[in-house]
Amino acid sequence: MQPATDTIAAIATAPGQAGVGIVRVSGPRAMAIARTMLGFEPKPRYAHYGPFRDRQGELIDEGIGLYFPNPHSFTGEDVFELQGHGGTVILDILLREVCSLGARLARPGEFSERAFLNDKLDLAQAEAIADLIESSSEQAARCAVRSMQGVFSKRVDNLVEAITHLRIYVEAAIDFPEEEIDFLADGKVASDLQGLLEQVQQILGEAQQGTILRDGMKVVIAGRPNAGKSSLLNALAGREAAIVTAIEGTTRDVLREHIHIDGMPLHIIDTAGLRDSPDEVEQIGIARAWEEIRQADRILLMVDATTTDKTEPHEIWPDFIDQLPRSAPVTVIRNKVDLSGEPLGISAESHQTAPVIRLAAKAAEGLEVLREHLKECIGFASTTEGGFLARRRHLDALERARDSLLQGQTQLEGYGAGELLAEDLRAAQDALGEITGHLTPDELLGKIFSSFCIGK
């Protein structure tokens, strides 16, 4: 992508009526538009209160005009803002007048795109702006601000720099064999490579938490009919989201509730009871339940504690466990312990294949233990000091970088192949470069910025 040469404009505030509405202009004609609508040439970075007029001198509105010359603006271009009254009609009139003076309507995210193209921010920072706007909790907002300030980008850049230094050392040994640099003998390359792997794994772990904080953790409640799945959904949601009866098969479709636990967003999904059923509608619900189960970040296997004393998933329901993906994380929920006489709490002994939580969903007893467990499942701390938000594409890039480094380690240890190691280091660099936008295809850039709201 090349920096733009035309002038764009958009309403930068949310649609609807409000006390203040903003029309934003960016590009080479920003000053000319400002001069026409204010009636004078505004002083840079000063708030000028007065009338906004059209080309014929007719009054449109009055408010504050702000002018920011390049490169000291959000986009890196000349920027002019009209801050007037927030009515839909008046903002549309202002925008039409601005466009008649040589601007065009901005595409979604085009202001942030221009800031990226003019090196005012990198791609991860630009995405953080959209994440800040869309944040669903205070902690997500705070982490988005840190990403916007470059906390995540700096970590990635430092890692890329370290890979670059190691790559230079390895390629020097390849290109200048007469210097007799033996990068196997002193262990420097192996040590540095291991350090890089530890760094990328640490960043990946933090990015996984940031992704869950942004997107939410998908928790699916599964089990046989009448195990108490809907009662648990209601208890966690704090309302009667699902109908609860003693009739088996009451829940026939997927029910979703979005909740927060100490700022962590969770998508709690209640599913139809799993069984062989001749009922066509129930069969559809069960099929949908399996779709959700296979995509879950955490599966809560609900067990009626009054019907069995088993705690191992394979012993409780071998057919169910055999159908799960191998990596599917399962927590056994022994429900109705107020009837079975078992104590509330959690047991997660080393010999257990899955944690076991004992609670009484209908009586809302033992829920705090479950909430704490869900936080621990993703390594979520009550504080997000130093944390950042991340996206799925960031995880993919970090995983590819890690895999390239692991492959390079194999080449080094198994064959002493410097050429192959150098290529793996380059692949890791390229993957990390996609995060900040240094090596990102134009098609992906367009897709990312088009998901932003207009005016950003």
Swiss-Prot record:
Its EC number is 3.6.-.-. GTP binds at residues 226-231, 245-251, 270-273. CDD domains: trmE (cd04164), TrmE_N (cd14858). Its cofactor is K(+). It is found in: Cytoplasm. K(+) binds at N226, T245, I247, T250. Belongs to the TRAFAC class TrmE-Era-EngA-EngB-Septin-like GTPase superfamily. TrmE GTPase family. This is tRNA modification GTPase MnmE. It comes from Marinobacter nauticus (strain ATCC 700491 / DSM 11845 / VT8).
